[in-house]
Design a protein with these regions (language model features):
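N-terminal secretory signal peptides that target proteins for export/translocation
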Residues: 1-2
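Hydrophobic, well-structured mid-protein blocks that either form specific transmembrane helices
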Residues: 108-151
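Generic alpha-helical structural signal
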Residues: 11-13, 24, 136
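Hydrophobic alpha-helical segments and their boundary regions
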Residues: 6-8, 30, 144, 212
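Bacterial N-terminal signal peptides
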Residues: 5-15
Length: 270
């Protein structure tokens, strides 16, 4: 299983509740947030999320996630993966999901396009390969590039919960997302902050993919996720914001910014 599949729960994890995002959205145009992904004592990867309007397509937002390996993972299983989600904001639903993966030398380019008018998914497994079609259920879909932003935009209250449909390749999945707390919380050796605690896990038929995700994001206009924990078959991962939140939110264990390796690469795209 790719690290990116459970990470989609960060990014997050039949829409039973038709979620309407508040306006304006929490992120500014061009926002970039970078996270350090730790596997026990190992710096395993860094993940950078960006958001900006899609040119010449009114109402469509381009969400991108760039995942790059770090530390010993870089030595034996280098990762350069970019996930792109073209998401319609009103109503919220994915319109195109693009995966450019380079993981341990395995290079893949995949595209998934849901056609809501006929409840059909179109999956393109690789350039030059035949298109594969599959049925989708009624209602909007998320993808692993858009979920983190929908979690940020949703009007959470303590105890509220939603079930979202998630599209991955040609497999419709389900994720149940709930709000555990809205309070001043002390997490990750930080002073108490006003935070929203979110819990996500596979739901229904998707429960065959075991795991869960907890996200803590600021309870303010920015709704910035600052810390998360991810549990899946390979263990538990800690995910810390290291760039984009400002000095008061970025994780700086020695008082200095943690270097972002992808910024020093001449060609970050896979």
């Amino acid at each position: 299983m790719s690290l990116l599949t459970p990470l989609g729960l960060f990014l997050l994890l039949t829409v039973l509740t038709h979620a309407q995002a508040p306006s304006p959205f929490p992120w500014p145009e061009g926002e970039k947030l970078t996270y350090l992904i730790e596997w026990g004592p190992i710096d395993a990867a860094e993940a950078t999320f960006t958001a900006r309007p899609e040119p010449k397509r009114d109402g469509i937002e381009r969400f991108e996630l760039f995942l790059r390996s770090r530390g010993p993972i870089e030595a034996f299983f280098p990762i350069r993966t970019r996930i792109t989600s073209l998401t319609q904001l009103h109503p919220w639903r994915t319109t195109e999901y693009i995966q450019d993966r380079n993981e341990g030398g395995n290079i893949r380019h995949r595209r998934t396009l849901p056609d809501y008018s006929v409840r059909l998914g179109r999956f393109f497994p690789a350039p030059g390969r035949t298109e594969e079609n599959f049925d989708i259920l009624e209602g909007p879909y998320e993808d692993f590039g858009s979920m983190l932003y929908h979690v940020r935009a949703y009007p959470w209250k303590k105890g509220s919960a939603v079930t979202w449909q998630v599209i991955e390749n040609k497999e419709p999945l389900f994720a149940k997302i709930s709000c555990s707390q809205v309070a001043r919380l002390e997490i990750d050796d930080r002073p108490p902050l006003p935070l929203i605690e979110i819990f996500g896990q596979p739901h229904g038929p998707s429960s065959r993919h075991p795991g869960w995700m907890k996200i803590w994001m600021t309870d303010d206009a920015r709704r910035i996720p600052i810390f998360a924990q991810l549990k899946f078959q390979y263990g538990t991962f800690d995910i810390r914001l290291i760039r984009g939140g400002g000095p008061e939110l970025d994780y700086r264990p020695d008082g200095e910014p943690i270097p972002i390796y992808s910024e020093t690469e001449s060609s970050p795209k896979p």
